[in-house]
């Protein structure tokens, strides 16, 4: 199928069946449905209705134009028929009058000889000549009225020619509108291809989004795995710290026991200070034991200090680890919020993209159906316009032919009128010559009657007819009289038979491009179509710029109560207080063991 202009030149070729078939293969068809039934108020139906109404208006306009042309043609034919009948009637009347005048003039001589009333008849010739002049003036008035009617017919012919030109211009505008429709179809096809490209880009972006979702899920899974490992590591560290706290508590209890022992030893040493001299051997052993115990206590103190340093290091490490855990929890919570927000935004974008794709598919389907219907309808309109154009061309050809025939008949009528005027001039000159001759004869008769006696004899027989005199010299042409009043219109004559159709004339030149028409009304929005199938994921896109810093979050709930901390270091011994009052003497203890023998004393030499 090819869409051409109405002019028949074939220059406005725009859309072919192959292109439409290719477009049908590329574009999926989605019916304009609404819950399983066709939509009652789709844009395609409204556009079809508006197009039908516009075409009906165009047909009505063409029908009115044809009726007007037919009425004008009938009026022209009636006027021409009435003119021809009036001219034929006037011609026949004047022919009859001229024949009668010739007969009367031929019968003047015998009447003048036979009857004496010839003078009276000669006296009546003056008013008859005046009547003839009046009739000639009436003929001139009729001819002037006929000229006016001829001018009116020429004006009607000009009106018909202008209407034919307007029809040709309208046909040119129709061809131009068809060309514009072809251009708009090309633009629609380009838009459809652009929509296909955008759908392909959207499919690629959806693929990228799904790939990013998979990557985010993998990252979240990895973060959860690392969080589990760190939690297990923290539990192990907590177990070790618990064990170390237990050992430290044991060491502290041992240290407290030792301090109690030392305090008891001090009390015993004070109590046994008086008996030191007696138990020197036990004191040496006890001093050795005390030195050993002090060394062991010094070692224990050093071990306790090392353990305290280790515990300080462990506590600082635990604090750092706890801070790292808090940071990691904060980052994980922030990442989870960001992922949730991104997933929500992605879901919103996906929903909006699905809605847009659905609307795009519905629009593509509607435009496809509308374009197909427009092409079919434009093809029908083109055929009807070409048929109407051919019929109009034939009618205009017949009308031009009839106008040319009418012009030929008017030329013939003018020639016949000129011949009639020449004949009338010749007859008037002959009449003037006859009148002059009759005046001369009248003068002769008057002289004869003067010389004749009163007695009157019987009239003699009529004499023979005289010879016709020579033609006189042609007189000067008289001035044109004033324009007479237009005569009344005669009765309409019967319509003549229709002539044979003539040969088809050559194809006329293409008219100028008409003005651009007014833009049509905007159609209503179509209903949403069914969603299309899900596309393949596209390639991964570039990393976007970091978003703006969000507002500070709301304070979180208070955490659970922590475990009791490790006991702090033992403080330095305070200042020695004032000595208290002397206590009561205690119970005398049992006698001690006998001490070892003392060293031998030195011998004095007094």
From Swiss-Prot:
Matching Pfam families: Collagen
Q: In which tissues is it expressed?
A: Expressed ubiquitously.
A GO CC annotation recorded here is: endoplasmic reticulum membrane
Q: Where is the composition biased (Gly residues)?
A: 526-535
Span list, region Disordered: 454-606
Q: Which residues form the Collagen-like domain?
A: 455-513, 544-603
* GO molecular function terms noted in the UniProt entry: scavenger receptor activity
**Compositional bias of kind Pro residues:** 545-558, 591-600
Segments on the Extracellular side according to the record's topology features: 78-606
Q: Which UniProt key words apply to this protein?
A: Collagen, Endoplasmic reticulum, Glycoprotein, Golgi apparatus, Membrane, Repeat, Signal-anchor, Transmembrane, Transmembrane helix
* Disulfide bond annotation, renumbered to this chain: none
Q: Which residues lie on this side of the membrane: Cytoplasmic?
A: 1-56
Matching entries from InterPro entries are given as: Collagen, Oxidative_Scav/Glycosyltrans
Establish whether keyword Protein biosynthesis is in the entry.
no
| Transmembrane regions listed in the UniProt entry | 57-77
Does this entry carry the keyword Repeat? yes
Localization in the cell: Endoplasmic reticulum membrane; Golgi apparatus membrane
Comp. bias regions, Low complexity: 485-519
Name the predominant localization: endoplasmic reticulum
Q: What does this protein do?
A: Seems to protect cells by scavenging oxidative molecules or harmful products of oxidation.
Q: What is this protein called?
A: Scavenger receptor class A member 3
Organism from which the protein derives: Homo sapiens (Human)
Q: What is the lineage of its organism?
A: Eukaryota, Metazoa, Chordata, Craniata, Vertebrata
Gene that produces this protein: SCARA3
